[in-house]
């Protein structure tokens, strides 16, 4: 038996994936799922365009993006994003950034900015997820509650979470 703490996007997806092979309980302190950071943030699925100095993070972002947009495709829609390189104070120039995009196989176009602050950048496609539809979907398929004597507890809460004390289960 697995207890997932936190009904944000991470907690809901993890509970959904695990419930195909395990008994899973999702505990969220709010009445509705996807209300905290999952609701207040941009709800944009990142491919890794904004991590030019971390290939490992880009690979993880791409993998997560592909998983999410495949499994939850009916809740996702594409969005065009421009990543512009500042004329002054940037830690990367446009040529290095474009090389990074090619090396990481991130789809993009090159764009000339009309801003005085940035001359060049990349046109990129990412995705947004529909929080209202996902909330309804997860609300129907996930078992909410507190597990009695769980074998595992997965803490997917955000900054206001107290630490879990180890008792008769493993903390992952």
Regions found by a protein language model. Give the residues of each.
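N-terminal Rossmann-like FAD-binding beta1-loop-alpha1 element of flavoenzymes
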Residues: 1-25
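Active-site substrate-recognition segment that forms the wall
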Residues: 12-19, 45, 74-78, 165-172
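Short glycine/proline-enriched coil/turn segments at helix->beta-strand junctions
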Residues: 18-23, 73, 118-119, 142-151, ...
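Glycine-rich FAD pyrophosphate-binding loop
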Residues: 19-40
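Rossmann-like dinucleotide-binding core of oxidoreductases
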Residues: 30-33, 44, 52-55, 69, ...
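Dinucleotide-binding Rossmann-like beta1-alpha1 core, especially the glycine-rich loop
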Residues: 42-120
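Predominantly flavin-linked oxidoreductase catalytic cores and closely associated redox partners
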Residues: 126-172
């Amino acid at each position: 038996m697995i207890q997932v703490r936190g009904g944000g996007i991470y907690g809901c997806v993890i509970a959904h994936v695990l419930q195909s092979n395990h008994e899973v309980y999702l505990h969220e302190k709010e009445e509705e799922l996807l209300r905290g950071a999952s609701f207040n943030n941009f709800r944009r699925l990142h491919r890794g365009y904004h991590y030019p100095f971390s290939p490992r993070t880009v690979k993880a972002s791409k993998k997560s993006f592909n998983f999410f947009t495949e499994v939850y495709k009916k809740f996702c829609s594409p969005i065009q994003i421009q990543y512009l390189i500042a004329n002054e104070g940037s830690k990367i120039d446009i040529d290095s950034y474009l090389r990074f995009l090619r090396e990481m196989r991130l789809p993009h176009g090159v764009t000339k900015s009309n801003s005085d602050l940035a001359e060049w950048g990349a046109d990129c496609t990412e995705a947004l997820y529909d929080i209202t539809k996902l909330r309804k979907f997860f609300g129907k398929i996930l078992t909410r509650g507190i597990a009695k004597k769980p074998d595992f507890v997965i803490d997917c809460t955000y900054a206001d979470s107290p630490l879990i004390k180890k008792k008769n289960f493993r903390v992952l």
